[in-house]
Amino acid sequence: MNRSSTINYQLSTIPNLRVAIVADWLTATGGAERVIHALHEIYPDAPIYTSTYEDASRRLFKNADVRTSWMQKLPRQIRKHQLLTLPRQWYFGHLKLRDYDLVISAGSSEAKAVRAPDGKHINICYTPTLQYWVKPENYLQKGSDSLNPIWRTGLRVLMPFVQRWDYKAAQRPDKMYAISTEVQKRIKKFYDREPDGIVSPPADIERFLNKGAVERKGFVTWGRQVQHKRLDLAIQACNEAGVDLLVIGDGPEHTRLQAMAGPTIRFK
């Protein structure tokens, strides 16, 4: 992506501004990581603070100064972000970025808790944390991830605590921007604060320009195939209606989704 065609952020470019970028985690190459990458394009010299950093994200950030937490040293098997809620709360809650004029956090979980004692903190909120506020039932039911039973039990017990922590963390940023009108409503409802505006996520629109119209039938869905995206509902609906559905993407739910797909469902 290039800056002129994909970056819509109305952020300062004052010379010599000391900037830090903060992300919940960098473990894939999805929309969340691409927002961080867009910020990196604007501020290429800004360090990126995050909890864990996996190989799947390294292509995007090969030239970035990524600074991870102590959680990066944990064995890969237990470095799943679902299991590290409390450690991340402690890490970001105690991370004081004193040497920066501007701190920009972006995410849906704990990054917003970072402190910027001597500067300003802008948060780009993807959504109030889904598993605490928006779709807790999706996270508490059995899924395909073998670690889910441990995580589900812990989340049920800790839900009141993590909700209180998340609410307080959401009050820390000086400015909080939503990525959509729906997220704007959620911030008002769950965090009791008025968002300062909407910042649309970057989109690589050059890929779609001058492609021409193509006659197709049915529906298309794409994204990471993880439980909370509920792609199973799209497949179930198209199975029952007998209409075509093209499912694009991959993830831990891929095998389960293929198993439930009827003759009108295709995967790519």
Where are these regions (language model features)?
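Active-site proximal beta-strand in glycosyltransferases
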Residues: 102-104, 115-148
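Membrane-proximal helix-turn-helix segments that form the acceptor-binding/catalytic region
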Residues: 143-176
